[in-house]
Curated annotation (Swiss-Prot):
Primary gene name: ygcU
InterPro entries (UniProt xref): Alkyl-DHAP_Synthase, FAD-bd_oxidored_4_C, FAD-bd_PCMH, FAD-bd_PCMH-like_sf, FAD-bd_PCMH_sub1, FAD-bd_PCMH_sub2, FAD-linked_Oxase-like_C, Oxid_FAD_bind_N
Entry keyword Flavoprotein: yes
The protein's Enzyme Commission number: 1.-.-.-
The protein's name in its UniProt record: Uncharacterized FAD-linked oxidoreductase YgcU
FAD-binding PCMH-type domain location: 47-226
A UniProt-annotated Pfam family: FAD-oxidase_C
Keywords: FAD, Flavoprotein, Oxidoreductase
Family that this chain belongs to: Belongs to the FAD-binding oxidoreductase/transferase type 4 family.
Any one Gene Ontology BP term: lactate catabolic process
Organism field: Escherichia coli (strain K12)
GO function terms (MF aspect): alkylglycerone-phosphate synthase activity; D-lactate dehydrogenase (cytochrome) activity; D-lactate dehydrogenase activity; FAD binding; flavin adenine dinucleotide binding
Superkingdom of this protein's organism: Bacteria
Length: 484
């Protein structure tokens, strides 16, 4: 027999103390969503099941005890730290869910200069860890635009990536070891070593699990020397995306690793670089690190771009100014809310990836299908995209779209605009051989394509869920679709 809402709250208070169990209605409503539903949120409308409680967890031991209780009574839990997620992964879609808030677990445990690694609890804000490292002359190398908001547990759980990934890698390249709590309360720790061949890499059961398999309580990441004085900036305008993709590929294949390598189409470039884009595509690079390496990297980039006569160099100071204003902190989020409420104009992104052989076709097919098939195309005020994370064998593509919300209630915006646009992007990307999600995580609004994304490998993911969360209490509806 399932517990009542009141009984759930009472037992949680017994486990962690009454002061850690939040039942204020406003807090509960805010914790039923993430930024995917920002339009109804701005209008004060919450249509999902409101959680029974938000539990402010203070230790791994508390996480273990709470999960053990929830597993025994089959209560759905939604792990949460910085709450900067954008794909619905934090939504509470099951009645009487409990939000497991780890933001109070906010201690930097160790900065180990000799072994070039740092250990932090799940609720440590990335910006706090980064600032502590920079004071000592080091960096995580991880710098997503959400850096002022995001916390370490969520960054690892969503398989996040930073703006300097072409040099430093994504979060999975940085994580050395972890501590996590399984659905039944079992605490598991993966030790910190540079590499091992002791079976499959079990870090990857935890990295990117989006709270659907376990709760991340502690992470250890690599650190690097921080040398911003050596940063070199390069910017170009050019006529077409195909040429831009070719340049990105050539730079990667030749072995150069700029920290930033970005290609914007004319539409997306215009909104970021009105002062020089002139209706053209934009290429941006930054070389950094050891001065000798940065210099050679910059020279190599300039040499490759020079082979394409259509590319015109722009003043590097313009690129540096752009670079210094990249991140989204609380002030920008607040300003965006005011602007949306005032204008009814929404902006979203959907990020995918593909090999060099298909990425341009993915870009063109998605843009064309949206323009010709989306029934509310007249409401779109901007449709474009950019590549911002490149690899030896391919790159990502951010599709960026703004639209005016017209003739619908705030709670209807998602199904009228956002979900149909997501659908086109996911379908075209998978059809052409790419991945429907590059670094935001599947969440609950791309989960419909999870099986199609993985194909015959879906059995492996299913096996993980059956093994580590047999009662299905971990973030229901994320990664794994709800079976009707």
């Amino acid at each position: 027999m399932s517990l009542s809402r009141a009984a759930i709250v009472d037992q949680l208070k017994e486990i962690v103390g009454a002061d850690r169990v939040i039942t204020d209605e406003t807090v509960l409503k805010k914790n039923s969503i993430d930024r995917f539903r920002k339009f109804p949120d701005i209008h004060g409308i919450y249509t999902l099941p409101i959680p029974a409680a938000v539990v402010k967890l203070g230790s791994t031991e508390q996480v273990s005890r709470v999960l053990n209780f929830m597993n025994a009574h089959k209560i759905n839990g939604v792990p949460r730290t910085g709450a900067s997620a954008t794909e619905g992964g934090l939504e509470t879609v099951v009645e009487n869910s409990v939000v497991l808030d780890g933001s109070a677990m906010n201690q930097i445990i160790n900065i180990d200069i000799e072994n070039m690694q740092a250990t932090a609890q799940c609720g440590v804000p990335l910006e706090v860890l980064e600032n502590a490292l920079r004071e000592k002359g080091y960096t995580t190398g991880h710098s997503p635009q959400s850096k002022p908001l995001a916390q370490m547990g969520g960054l690892v759980a969503t398989r996040s990536i930073g703006q300097f990934s072409t040099l430093y890698g994504a979060i999975e390249d940085m994580v050395v070891g972890l501590e996590a709590v399984l659905a039944d309360g079992t605490v598991t720790r993966i030790k910190n070593v540079p590499r091992r061949a002791a079976g499959p890499d079990i870090r990857h059961i935890i990295i990117g699990n989006e709270g659907a398999l376990c709760y991340i309580t502690e992470v250890t990441v690599k650190i690097f020397k921080f040398t911003p004085e050596n940063n070199l900036f390069y910017g170009y305008i050019l006529e077409d995306m195909k040429t831009g993709f070719n340049i990105l590929r050539e730079i990667m294949v030749e072995g150069y690793r700029p920290s930033i390598a970005r290609l914007y189409d004319a539409e997306d470039g215009t909104q970021h670089f009105t002062h020089f884009a002139d209706g053209k595509c934009v290429l941006i690079f930054m070389a950094e690190g050891n001065p000798r390496i940065a210099k050679v990297t910059g020279e190599g980039i300039a040499e490759i771009v020079a082979r394409y006569p259509q590319c015109q160099r722009v003043d590097s100071k313009l690129i540096e100014t752009w670079f210094n204003n990249l991140n989204w902190g609380p002030d920008k989020v607040a300003a965006e809310r005011v602007q949306i409420l005032k204008t009814g104009n929404m902006g979203f992104t959907t990020e995918v990836s593909g090999c060099w052989s298909c990425i341009h076709e993915i870009y063109e097919s998605v843009i064309n299908r949206i323009r010709t098939e989306f029934p509310h195309a007249d409401d779109i005020t901007m449709l474009g995209g950019h590549s911002s994370h490149s690899y030896q064998n391919g790159t990502n593509m951010y599709f960026v779209y703004d639209y005016n919300v017209v003739d619908c209630k705030p709670e209807e915006e998602i199904d009228k605009y956002h979900n149909p646009l997501n659908k086109i992007i996911c379908e075209e990307t998978i059809r052409l051989g790419g991945s429907m999600v590059h670094h935001h995580g599947i969440g609950k609004h791309r989960v419909h394509w999870s099986k199609l994304e993985h194909g015959s490998a879906w059995a492996l993911l299913e096996g993980l869920k059956k093994q580590f969360d047999p009662n299905g209490i971990m973030n229901t509806g994320t990664i794994y679709p709800i079976e009707k």
